[in-house]
Amino acid sequence: MDKTLLESTVHKVLDELRNRPIPLGVSNRHIHLCAADYARLFPEQAIREKKALLQPGQYAAEQTITLAGPKSQLKKVRLLGPLRNVSQVEISRTDARTLGIAAPLRMSGDLQGTPGIRLISPFAELELASGVIVAQRHIHMSPLDALIFRVAHGDTVSVAIEGSERRLIFDNVAIRVSPDMRLEMHIDTDEANAAGADDPHTFASLVARR
């Protein structure tokens, strides 16, 4: 194969990879707990896996928690595993209004200055001092994915939600790159409803880097 043909073939393959559908994950309200908070809420109980998630090693647990805010409660909020270093609650804007909490838009782990909430399990209650956020929409990528899409960790991009009757373009989609991540875009339930993402044929596609 001559050099020109080889380069043409490589560019064609890369273009196909860049234009391939990005799996779309809809994140319902959920909670991450540190070991100490988990032990208080579920004493002498091992965390039990209910369903594996697409991201390697992550799963929805059998355990659920009630979130108690100033205005209302949300019951049966799913715990995600494994346990983390810091407890964190991720909700939608609609959930925040229901609870009466001014949860800021943040990336996971960016918890400084965030409000707290009361956590209630079947065994105990715990006042979480901070950690309630509305998660910024984002795309998980491996380093190879990032190389193919020509983006880097911390970049923001515009993404089209395709495949439903309510095609929508989201700006300010954060890129998160790690060797243990698989390609997947995460949006919350408010964003999913706006884009008609309950359609099983829905997927994400990169529109532009911002």
Curated annotation (Swiss-Prot):
It is found in: Bacterial microcompartment. GO terms for cellular component: bacterial microcompartment. It comes from the Bacteria. The keyword Electron transport does not apply. CoA binds at residues 26-28, 71, 78, 193. Its cofactor is Zn(2+). Its EC number is 2.3.1.222. Zn(2+) 1 binds at residues 30, 32, 90. Phosphate binds at residue 84. Formed by 2 beta-barrels, each is capped on both ends by short alpha-helices. This is Phosphate propanoyltransferase. The lineage of its organism: Bacteria, Pseudomonadati, Pseudomonadota, Gammaproteobacteria, Enterobacterales.
